[in-house]
Amino acid sequence: MNQSVSAAPVVSAGSVTFGQDRPLSIIAGPCQMESRAHALEVAGALKEIAARLNIGLVFKTSFDKANRTSASGARGLGLKQALPVFAEIGSSLGLPVLTDVHEAAQCTEVAQAVDVLQIPAFLCRQTDLLLAAAATGKVVNVKKGQFLAPWDMANVVAKITGGGNPNVLVTERGASFGYNTLVSDMRSLPILARTTGAPVIFDATHSVQQPGGNGTSSGGEREFVPVLARAAVAVGVAGVFIETHPDPDHAPSDGPNMVPLREFEALVRRLMAFDALAKAADPALPK
């Protein structure tokens, strides 16, 4: 287990910066793009919240949920319909945009409309996909597979940087623990930073997912999102990934682990307070 790499750099997605010693930034949005109107509604609300809190925010949503538990699960708007919406969110709202890619052939086209290409956890070792994403020059956010140790991600990141792209983020989203269960080992956060040399993101919503736990869909325990998010920020991360939705109980995917949009601002405000304390050079002792 090699843990000797250079200090984590700062990676910028548009105007939003991610760094282990920089103020916390957020990646947030609904699980999948349900419609143009829905995406713009949520993105607009998140932009207003980010402005009030003075925090960097990257908007995320998926054009295709290609790994749904069941073939009957809704997958999203689709690539061709989603691309102009991604571009519109970036141009009209000024938010950097993140979406995931599943095939190497998608990367060039998607990169024309977004700022960050995300590699899903299940695909994090697919070399051709990683190299295609790297070749776009966009920021690449690669999620740690639920089946990998944190130090295994050094080889994953090396594929991207070896492809000539230093702009890499690494996301922790839990580790498989028995059937239909994930656990979050907070030790993985500093290990990821140390072994990959990349800014580390904590995915607070997928970490409480129960994969396949509802038979034809995944379950989740959204009540633990704030708990794990606070723990991760206290340990020290560059950013937190939070899926949010105006009505998660009726969302087409990942509803059980998404944060209701009405609760998002209070959660992020609390995380910012934890982040300020965790990154303070000399925290004042309580009087």
From Swiss-Prot:
Q: State which pathway it belongs to.
A: Carbohydrate biosynthesis; 3-deoxy-D-manno-octulosonate biosynthesis; 3-deoxy-D-manno-octulosonate from D-ribulose 5-phosphate: step 2/3; Bacterial outer membrane biogenesis; lipopolysaccharide biosynthesis
**Annotated EC:** 2.5.1.55
- Biological process GO terms, please? keto-3-deoxy-D-manno-octulosonic acid biosynthetic process
Which Gene3D superfamilies does the record cross-reference, listed alphabetically? Aldolase class I (3.20.20.70)
Q: Where in the cell is it found?
A: Cytoplasm
- The transmembrane segments are none
Pfam families in UniProt: DAHP_synth_1
Q: Does the keyword Membrane apply?
A: no
GO molecular function term, any single one: 3-deoxy-8-phosphooctulonate synthase activity
Instruction: Give the source's domain of life in one word.
Output: Bacteria
Q: GO CC terms for this protein?
A: cytoplasm
What reaction does this enzyme carry out catalytically?
A: D-arabinose 5-phosphate + phosphoenolpyruvate + H2O = 3-deoxy-alpha-D-manno-2-octulosonate-8-phosphate + phosphate
Give the residue range of the signal peptide: none
Q: Which UniProt keywords apply?
A: Cytoplasm, Lipopolysaccharide biosynthesis, Transferase
In the UniProt record, does the keyword Cell inner membrane occur? no
HAMAP family from the xrefs?
Answer: KDO8P_synth (MF_00056)
Q: Which family does it belong to?
A: Belongs to the KdsA family.
Protein name in the entry: 2-dehydro-3-deoxyphosphooctonate aldolase
Protein source organism: Nitrobacter hamburgensis (strain DSM 10229 / NCIMB 13809 / X14)
Q: Which gene encodes it?
A: kdsA
